[in-house]
C-alpha cells in the first residue's frame, strides 16, 4: 500500500522484486483496502472516494485480466440537502510545508452572510482526519453543524500521520507547540474568508484534540470565542 498518488489516499501496487518496477492495482481514485488471494493472482479491492460511495471488486494482480465488480454502492446521502465540502492546501507555520484542510460551508450557503465557524482539531501523532473518502472523512457531526449554519474547518497539521518521517518528527520533544502554530494558520485562513464572522470562531476536539483545544484556548485566547475540550489526554504524552 502506498500514498504515492496522494497523501490523502491509499493505493495498492504490485512490485517486481527483480527489477523494482511497480504497477498500480485497481482504480487510481480513493482509499483502498485490499485482501490478497492465497494464489497471489487476485485481490479483493474495497474502496471509496469523495465521488465513489463504495466499490468492491476482484482485481487480477497481473493486470492482464478484467476486473470483476462485486458491489457498486449508491450514495446514501443522495436525497439529503448536503453542505458543500472541499479540500485544499495552506502553508504550515514553517512557510514551506503544504497542509491539507477540509472546509464545510453551511447548508444553503449565502456568500453575503457572516457565519460562525468551528475548528475541529485532533492534531496528534498516528492520526489523519482528511482522506479521499466519502465526504472527505467529514463525520455526521460536522455535517450536522453545517446544517445549523456553521463553517467547519479541519487541518491536518505537521506531526500527524501519512506524510513521512520528517513531517511527523517536527513535534519531537516539543509536542503541542508546532501543531498549534499550524492550527493558527488554519484560523488565519478562516479569517481571510469574507463570509466568516471573525468574532465567532470556536475550537473543539477530543483526546489529543481535547489537549489541543485547551492549549489553543490558553495560548491564543484572542482567536477563539469558545472552546470545547472532550476526553483530554492526561498521560505523559501531553503533560511532560
Segments (PLM) and residue ranges:
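Short glycine/acidic-enriched loop and turn motifs that connect beta-strands
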Residues: 3-7, 49-52
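Repetitive beta-architecture junctions, highlighting loop-to-beta-strand starts
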Residues: 8-12, 20, 54, 99
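Short loop/turn segments that connect beta-strands within beta-propeller blades
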Residues: 16-20, 61-63
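Surface loop/turn motifs at the tips and blade-to-blade linkers of beta-strand repeat domains
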Residues: 25-29
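Serine-hydrolase catalytic core recognition
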Residues: 31-240
